[in-house]
Amino acid sequence: MSDGIAPRVVAARVLALVVDQGRSLKTELAAALPTLEDVRDRALVEAICFAVLRRRPVYEAALTRWLARPLGRGDAQLRGLLMVGFAQLDVLKVPPYAALSATVDACRVLGWPHRVSFVNAVLRRAQRERLPVVSSDAAWPRWLAERIRADWGEQAEAIFDASLKPAPMWLRVNLRYGDRHTYVQRLQAAGLEAVPSGLVPEALALDCSVPVVQLPGFQGGEVSVQDLSAQQVAALLSPAPHARLLDACAAPGGKAAHLLERAPTLCLTALDVDMQRLRRVAETCDRIHVKARLCVADATDLAAWWDGEPFDAVLLDAPCSATGVVRRQPDVLLHRRAEDLLPLLNIQSRLLDACWRTLRPGGVLVYVTCSVLRAENQTQLEAFLARTADACAEDPGDAYGQPAGLGRQRLPGEQGGDGFFYARLIKDISM
């Protein structure tokens, strides 16, 4: 297969699985990318897939406008290939000759020599004409867009707009190995530029996304990839150096790792219901040379995992709609259904109640989600406080976003971070 063709073929296949079969983008990329030897080809596949999913309504509108007959249900890969071509011209700014040539050749490799002239004609039209204009919420399911508008009013447009933009690559420098300024110099020596955050002393925003193998010291645990909003959780919890700490929904392990980098003497229990995902926590701990007690269990089933000794602090990063991280997971909008929300709310409620039972009087529970839905955030928090007499909320402060009831909400893109909700709860020592 000639240069440039393979990544277009892979991207078309991945997009067909994600868009037409409801597969996870992360899962399909994890399976497909290792088939490409060149890291540049892998990066191109990722860039194409993300661009297509962010701009999918525009490309679908173009196909509707330009095709005399709509593509059939059996044409998923062909539809994906056309969108691969659109993304190269529209977002990635690949030179038109290279984009058309490689995409047309990919059509042959995919087994459609009789469709080559068709693909070429559609892409040449995309080169000549302006793509249709669609609303910023066009990719969002109607029920979800309406809920965002009801929750956020005039700020809803900012949420939709931010979710269409690529997210920066945030790094977390492990200060056990050196200071942030020194690491910036190492990045510069590797040809990379980064901007420090004023909110988190370990945080750096890269000027472009790169494979982790290009990050100095990554394999040795000197740096990790973690969004700014997620990095802020450690400071909000601020456990004492030898505290007993529970991370109740720990996978993939970034927040637990950050807490242990800051305080390696923590007695941290990392809990997750999924064995495969918990293995990622173990791999992360091994890479950064810290230790945690790992436990596969449902956090709500206390009899299955808790020995009855209270924790000093609990982190509950609850399962949620992921509406705050659409810019990183654009396929969320393809998969999310209205009927998904109530089960999520029930799980969050049960997790809050169970985790609270494990917390000692005077202890701290931090509840976070990567959602922008009030039902999962401030409404969930208010309901918990109403039924829990010994719980009180502390304001996390302005660094964590705008007030949202008794918590704080960062909207997507604010301070460069993902959409995140934060609440800090204290267990009353007098009750």
UniProtKB/Swiss-Prot annotation:
Name the catalysed reactions.
cytidine(967) in 16S rRNA + S-adenosyl-L-methionine = 5-methylcytidine(967) in 16S rRNA + S-adenosyl-L-homocysteine + H(+)
In the Enzyme Commission scheme, what number(s) does this protein have?
2.1.1.176
Highest taxon of the lineage: Bacteria
How would you classify this enzyme at the top EC level? transferase
Question: Which residues are recorded as binding S-adenosyl-L-methionine?
Answer: C249, A250, A251, P252, G253, G254, K255, D272, D298, D317
Which PROSITE patterns has this protein been placed in? NOL1_NOP2_SUN, SAM_MT_RSMB_NOP
Active site positions, chain numbering = C370
The record's keywords, sorted A to Z, are: Cytoplasm, Methyltransferase, Ribosome biogenesis, RNA-binding, rRNA processing, S-adenosyl-L-methionine, Transferase
UniProt-listed CDD domains? AdoMet_MTases
Q: What are the subcellular locations of this protein? A: Cytoplasm
GO cellular component, as recorded: cytosol
An example of a Gene Ontology BP annotation on this entry? regulation of DNA-templated transcription
Q: Which InterPro entries match?
A: MeTrfase_RsmB-F_NOP2_cat, MeTrfase_RsmB-F_NOP2_dom, NusB-like_sf, NusB_RsmB_TIM44, RCMT, rRNA_ssu_MeTfrase_B, RsmB-like_ferredoxin, RsmB/NOL1/NOP2-like_CS
* Annotated GO MF terms: RNA binding; rRNA (cytosine-C5-)-methyltransferase activity
Described by its record, this protein's role is as follows: Specifically methylates the cytosine at position 967 (m5C967) of 16S rRNA.
The record's PANTHER family line, in alphabetical order, gives: NOL1_NOP2_SUN FAMILY PROTEIN _ ANTITERMINATION NUSB DOMAIN-CONTAINING PROTEIN, NOP2 YEAST -RELATED NOL1/NOP2/FMU SUN DOMAIN-CONTAINING
Q: Which family does it belong to?
A: Belongs to the class I-like SAM-binding methyltransferase superfamily. RsmB/NOP family.
- Which protein is depicted? Ribosomal RNA small subunit methyltransferase B
Lineage, highest ranks first: Bacteria, Pseudomonadati, Pseudomonadota, Gammaproteobacteria, Lysobacterales
